[in-house]
């Protein structure tokens, strides 16, 4: 058993639908511990910095515009094989391809407004967590 941390964003469209609690319930039902979480409204600079790897791609400006269109909830999840299990719970990036019962199948509106973000590797998780959280803001749970 390998306990990992992964990073999650509940995106503006899901926040607007008032499904934060439903998504958090799904995290906990899947065995994740939420060890850090906060709601914030991303500035253009924060969104551009977070998604810097996509700069220059055709969807970049629309992604930044969407991610700054309303509040988001950023979270740190902890659990066994957390990165892959969280990705499985989210479903395919394109909700049209997401399996029934995944977060994106249930809450996404489109390819861009796909309800959630999750780290794609342990390395990305560490970078993304550090982008939004100081170590003192993460509370490891032992029970």
Swiss-Prot record:
ATP binds at residues 11, 59, 87, 93, 104, 114. The keyword ATP-binding applies. PROSITE patterns: NDPK_LIKE. One of its GO terms (molecular function) is metal ion binding. Its cofactor is Mg(2+). GO terms for cellular component: cytoplasm. It is found in: Cytoplasm. The active site is at residue 117. It catalyses: a 2'-deoxyribonucleoside 5'-diphosphate + ATP = a 2'-deoxyribonucleoside 5'-triphosphate + ADP; a ribonucleoside 5'-diphosphate + ATP = a ribonucleoside 5'-triphosphate + ADP. Keywords: ATP-binding, Cytoplasm, Kinase, Magnesium, Metal-binding, Nucleotide metabolism, Nucleotide-binding, Phosphoprotein, Transferase. Its EC number is 2.7.4.6. Its main location: cytoplasm. PANTHER family: NUCLEOSIDE DIPHOSPHATE KINASE, NUCLEOSIDE DIPHOSPHATE KINASE DDB_G0292928-RELATED. NCBIfam families: PRK00668.1. Homotetramer. Major role in the synthesis of nucleoside triphosphates other than ATP. The ATP gamma phosphate is transferred to the NDP beta phosphate via a ping-pong mechanism, using a phosphorylated active-site intermediate. This is Nucleoside diphosphate kinase. It comes from Erwinia tasmaniensis (strain DSM 17950 / CFBP 7177 / CIP 109463 / NCPPB 4357 / Et1/99). The lineage of its organism: Bacteria, Pseudomonadati, Pseudomonadota, Gammaproteobacteria, Enterobacterales.
């Amino acid at each position: 058993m390998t306990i990992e941390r992964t990073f999650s964003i509940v995106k503006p469209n899901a926040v607007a639908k008032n499904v934060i609690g439903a998504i958090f319930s799904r995290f906990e039902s899947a065995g994740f511990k939420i060890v850090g979480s906060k709601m914030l409204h991303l500035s253009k600079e924060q969104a551009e910095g977070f998604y810097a790897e996509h700069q220059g791609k055709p969807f970049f400006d629309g992604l930044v515009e969407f991610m700054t269109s309303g509040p988001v909830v950023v979270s740190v999840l902890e659990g066994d094989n957390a990165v892959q299990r969280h990705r499985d719970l989210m479903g395919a990036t394109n909700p049209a391809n997401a399996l029934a019962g995944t977060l994106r199948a249930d809450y996404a509106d489109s390819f861009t407004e796909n309800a959630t973000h999750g780290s794609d590797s342990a390395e990305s998780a560490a970078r993304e967590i550090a982008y939004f959280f100081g170590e003192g803001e993460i509370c490891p749970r032992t029970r």
